[in-house]
Structures are given as structure tokens and as C-alpha cells.
Swiss-Prot record:
Gene: ispE
Catalytic activity: 4-CDP-2-C-methyl-D-erythritol + ATP = 4-CDP-2-C-methyl-D-erythritol 2-phosphate + ADP + H(+)
TM stretches of this protein: none
Active site: K14, D140
Similarity-based family: Belongs to the GHMP kinase family. IspE subfamily.
HAMAP family: IspE (MF_00061)
Pathway named in the protein's UniProt entry: Isoprenoid biosynthesis; isopentenyl diphosphate biosynthesis via DXP pathway; isopentenyl diphosphate from 1-deoxy-D-xylulose 5-phosphate: step 3/6
Binding site for ATP: P98, M99, G100, G101, G102, L103, G104, G105, G106, S107, S108
InterPro entries the record matches: GHMP_kinase_C_dom, GHMP_kinase_C_sf, GHMP_kinase_N_dom, IspE, Ribosomal_Su5_D2-typ_SF, Ribsml_uS5_D2-typ_fold_subgr
Protein name (record): 4-diphosphocytidyl-2-C-methyl-D-erythritol kinase
Listed GO biological process terms: isopentenyl diphosphate biosynthetic process, methylerythritol 4-phosphate pathway; terpenoid biosynthetic process
């Protein structure tokens, strides 16, 4: 008899509250300084362990299941191989986060897969080992594994937990996909922002070095940002396309959401310095 399905493992979105590109390494990767904070909008994953060793992904989104490079499958297979386990898993994905919007949904799904199967397969790796496995899948997978709002340096893998204000955000989702690779390969990208200490960064005006380039080439992002900035301090997350405005109160964000033009989509979310994944793990 198979084990029961372990349900509702959250994979939260993240915002880059600031993002500075401070250099480029010889291997082509970029040096960053950024601040990650989670928001309370999540994908959800269910897991059922099997004894045959097969890893299978189920989703209502056929293109997710058909993608053999899907990060969920990569994460599960990487952990299975690293730990030498013979068990497999059926994985069900409820995809609620926009894809390719700079909210980290794919990386978060991978992180939740590693954290959940580490528990369900009784591997019990330390979180740092999971983060090492996750880093090979993507630079921002480790922050989702650790589950704490963090200041990040290097390519984004050197993490220091911080406690920024947990504000309310109105997140707009422009109907366009921005290629992260294209942005970081562009000769127009600012790559020489001076490195600053964490204390200086936390006290200054926050910005995103990728924003100027993206809004120059993607009018949908430019239009969303120019509309939102009329109501609140606003900027882009990651390499876009999503942009966010920050508010002190939920009601303020909801009031602006109600004014949203019919050609734009968005949602209101709460900033979280502790990922809901940690609470789910505690109840595994």
C-alpha cells in the first residue's frame, strides 16, 4: 500500500526589493547585490512517495508537464541521485504564480520539491546541502530553501538573513515574457554599480539596475510601471516583467487595484520575511 499524499506544500513568490549589478565574472555570470523578500502568493505542490523509483509530474498545464527540463523534475532527480535513494514520487503542481515574471516561481517550485522530498524520503539532509543542490538548478533556489528574507551577493547565492518591513504590495503582471538571459547579455545593461555595505543599502532609495533596459524594450512593462508609480513607490522585480508598488496598508493597495485599467492584471500581496514553506515543513 502506497503512503498517503502529502498535500499543500507552498512555493511562495519573491520580490527583489532592490537589485544592483556590480560586475561580471570571467565565466559570464554577473555579480549582484539584491534583497529577497517573500510574498503570500504561492504555487502549491502535493507529493506521494512510490517504491518503483519513478518521478512523475502532474499538472493541469500541459506545457509544464511536457517540459523535460522542468525544474521540479530536475530537483527531484538531483536529490534522488545525490542521496542514492531508490524511492520515487508522484508530484502534483497547482500553478498559481505567473511564469517568467521575475517572481521566482520556477525556482520556488524546485526549492519546495527539494525540501519536501528531503523529508518524505527520510533523507534529512542539512539545509545547506539542499541549498548546494539547489544552486546548480538556479541562483535563487537557495533563498527559497532557507526560507528567510535575505540580502544576497555573488551570483545571488551568498545569503544573509535580514528583516525589511513587511509591507503590502500591488503586483502588476504585464502580458509579456522578458528573457533573463537576453537582459544579462545586453551591452546596454548597467554592470558597474558600486558595491555598498548592507547598512548603507538598507537605508537608501531602492532601485533595480535591470529596470531601465527592460522598460526601453518592453512597452508593456513601461506602461505598467508608469501607471503604478502615480500611486506608490514602484519598481520592477528581477528582470521583469512584473512590477510592484509598496503600501503601508492592505486597504490602500486594494483601492489602487480597483482603479486598474481593464488591459492590466495584478494582485495584492503581503510581504513575508519567513517563508510559509518553513511552517509546512514543521508539520510534515
Amino acid at each position: 500500500m502506497r503512503p498517503p499524499i502529502s498535500k499543500s506544500w507552498p512555493a511562495p513568490a519573491k520580490l527583489n526589493l532592490f537589485l544592483h549589478v556590480t560586475g561580471q565574472r570571467d565565466d559570464g555570470y554577473h555579480e549582484l547585490q539584491t534583497l529577497f523578500q517573500f510574498i503570500d502568493h504561492c504555487d502549491y505542490l502535493d507529493f506521494q512517495v512510490n517504491l518503483c523509483g519513478e518521478i512523475k509530474l502532474h499538472s493541469e498545464l500541459s506545457k509544464v508537464v511536457a517540459d523535460k527540463d522542468n525544474l521540479i523534475l530536475q530537483a527531484a532527480k538531483s536529490l534522488q541521485k545525490h542521496a542514492g535513494v531508490t524511492q520515487g514520487a508522484d508530484i502534483w503542481l497547482e500553478k498559481l504564480l505567473p511564469m517568467g515574471g521575475g517572481l521566482g516561481g520556477g525556482s520556488s517550485d524546485a526549492a519546495t520539491t527539494l525540501v519536501a522530498l528531503n523529508a518524505l524520503w527520510n533523507i534529512n539532509y542539512h539545509v545547506d546541502i539542499l541549498a548546494e543542490i539547489g544552486l546548480k538548478l538556479g541562483a535563487d533556489v537557495p533563498v527559497f530553501i532557507h526560507g528567510l528574507a535575505s540580502f544576497a551577493e555573488g551570483v545571488g547565492e551568498q545569503l544573509k538573513p535580514v528583516l525589511p518591513a513587511e509591507k503590502w504590495y500591488l503586483v502588476l503582471v504585464p502580458n509579456v515574457h522578458v528573457s533573463t538571459q537576453a537582459i544579462f547579455q545586453s551591452p546596454e545593461l548597467t554592470r558597474n554599480t558600486p558595491k555598498l555595505s548592507l547598512s548603507n543599502l538598507m537605508s537608501q532609495h531602492w532601485s533595480n539596475d535591470c529596470e531601465k533596459l527592460v522598460i526601453a524594450h518592453y512597452p508593456q512593462v513601461a506602461n505598467a510601471l508608469s501607471w503604478l508609480v502615480e500611486y506608490a513607490p514602484s519598481r520592477m522585480t528581477g528582470t521583469g516583467a512584473c512590477v510592484f508598488g509598496e503600501f503601508e496598508q492592505e486597504q490602500q493597495a486594494l483601492a489602487v487595484l480597483a482603479e486598474l485599467p481593464p488591459n492590466m492584471t495584478g494582485f495584492v500581496a503581503k510581504g513575508m520575511n519567513r517563508s510559509p514553506l518553513l511552517e509546512r515543513l514543521a508539520n510534515a
